[in-house]
Amino acid sequence: MSAQADRVMDLSEWENRWQEGRTGFHRSDVHNLLKANVDKLICGRREVRFFFPLCGKAVDMKWLADMGHTVVGVEFSEKGIKEFSQEQNLEYNEEAVADIPGAKLFKSTDGKISIYQCDLYKFSSAVAGHFGGIWDRGALVAINPCDRQKYASLLVSLMSSDCRYLLDTLEYNPELYKGPPFFVSEDDIKTVFGGSCNIDLLQSVDGFEEKHRSWGLDSLTEKLYLLTTKTQ
């Protein structure tokens, strides 16, 4: 991480990406690693509450909701949230969030999907309780490297005792590309989550796409981990 340790993006930069349509991080289909490992995430449970950090307009939220689960996301960009509702043909209600000044809650009328529009670090279990599942795709790899411990502490605080947390990461040569998305190694994960969580590598795949050449890369590996609380 050393080559990227000082790289910092503020929320306005992310908002600008949404406003300018520079959302290459968005996938129009359900993530292949989620589909391949969803049974390990659900683990035979019904009506699981899932948390999506920095959810954007991930179609994975609707996919899990359609299975009978409920989803709570946090996203800073209101534009991203409204695009999600429009693209998924969801009617929603909008309300203020008492515990987070200035935040808004966008909740689908069927109650299956709730998205908080706010700074992730102002969110807490006091706002929305604990979760039995977390799908972290494009979140840990997007936050500033200097904030990883703060991020991990927040995510652990949201985990119920039986929570199953799928974490998607990217590995490449960080000397060649400054991010985001940032390089995250297994050692990085152990550093910030190892004290509280068991960490198991589920899958490692070649994630290189042609667009990555414009980043100056010629290889990229995508890895999926399962995190569970050490109390399990």
Curated annotation (Swiss-Prot):
GO molecular function: thiopurine S-methyltransferase activity
Coiled-coil region(s): none
Subcellular location: Cytoplasm
Residues that coordinate or bind substrate: 25
Keywords: Cytoplasm, Methyltransferase, S-adenosyl-L-methionine, Transferase
Xref: Pfam families: TPMT
GO biological process annotation, one example: methylation
EC number: 2.1.1.67
Reactions performed catalytically: S-adenosyl-L-methionine + a thiopurine = S-adenosyl-L-homocysteine + a thiopurine S-methylether
Residue numbers binding S-adenosyl-L-methionine: 14-25, 54, 75, 137
PROSITE patterns, per the entry: SAM_MT_TPMT
Major enzyme class: transferase
GO CC annotation: cytoplasm
Assigned protein family: Belongs to the class I-like SAM-binding methyltransferase superfamily. TPMT family.
PANTHER family with a match to the protein in the record: THIOPURINE S-METHYLTRANSFERASE
HAMAP family reported in the protein's UniProt record: Thiopur_methtran
Official protein name in the record: Probable thiopurine S-methyltransferase
Organism: Danio rerio
Lineage per the UniProt record: Eukaryota, Metazoa, Chordata, Craniata, Vertebrata
GN (gene name): tpmt
